[in-house]
A protein has these predicted regions:
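The catalytic-center signature of Zn2+-dependent metalloproteases
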Residues: 110, 123-169
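Surface-exposed patches in mature extracellular/periplasmic domains of secreted proteins
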Residues: 63-73, 127-133, 171-175
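A short alpha-helix/helix-coil micro-patch that ends at or immediately precedes a cysteine
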Residues: 39-68
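Active-site recognition of the HExxH zinc-binding catalytic motif
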Residues: 59, 114-128
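Catalytic zinc-binding patch centered on the HExxH motif and its immediate surroundings
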Residues: 29, 77-101
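Short pre-active-site segment immediately N-terminal to the catalytic Zn-binding motif
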Residues: 100-117
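Secretory targeting and sorting signals
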Residues: 1-27
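Acidic/histidine-rich, surface-exposed loop or edge segments in extracytoplasmic proteins
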Residues: 32-44, 95-102, 140-141
């Protein structure tokens, strides 16, 4: 086999492989482009902004289909205050809209980033699971004051990825018409 034939063959293989590489890069780009952005406002919780940002970061590094960031037109707001028995909680539709209330007393007692990440989990569509271990972010305060895990576990990540796969839309409602 001549060097010329070998070179021509190598160029031919490269030309055939390049569209595959470009195609897979394009798929990654479109997947990333499909991520829904939830705009948040931390202006109502200035004392805890750094912990809120860190909690958002835990979600952003864990999931691809939704990303949270501070931007104009916020649909998710964080406020701080004393909320008594309710403590920190979220009033949300689970679709990235609502208000997260950060309680002073709980922030003094529990891991601050865990609280903000946990409450953000509600805004993304997850429910509480207080009986869960510390490794479950949505076990919340049920895991005790010694728990410092602020990252969603594999099951929580998969749930969010599934729910936000095409942007999170309202759940389907079925009715039988007669």
């Amino acid at each position: 086999m001549s060097v010329k034939s070998l070179f021509a063959g190598a160029v031919g293989v490269a030309v055939l492989v390049m569209p595959v590489i470009a195609s897979s890069a394009s798929a990654e780009t479109s997947s990333a482009a499909a991520a829904k952005t939830v705009c948040v406002s931390t202006s109502g919780a200035p004392q805890f902004r750094q912990y809120i940002i860190a909690g958002l970061g835990k979600w952003n590094e864990s999931v691809r289909n939704v990303q949270l960031k501070e931007c104009a037109g916020a649909t998710l707001r964080y406020v701080e205050g004393s909320y008594g028995q309710q403590g920190s909680h979220a009033v949300t539709n689970g679709h990235g809209q609502g208000t997260i209330y950060i309680d002073y007393q709980q922030m003094a007692k529990y891991d601050k980033v865990r609280i903000t990440a946990h409450e953000t989990g509600h805004a993304l569509g997850l429910k509480d699971h207080y009986q869960g271990p510390c490794s479950e972010l949505m076990s919340g305060g049920g895991a005790g004051t010694s728990c410092h895990n602020a990252s969603p576990n594999a099951q929580e990540r998969q749930s969010i990825e599934r729910m936000w796969a095409n942007g999170y839309t309202a759940p389907e409602t079925w009715s039988i018409q007669q």
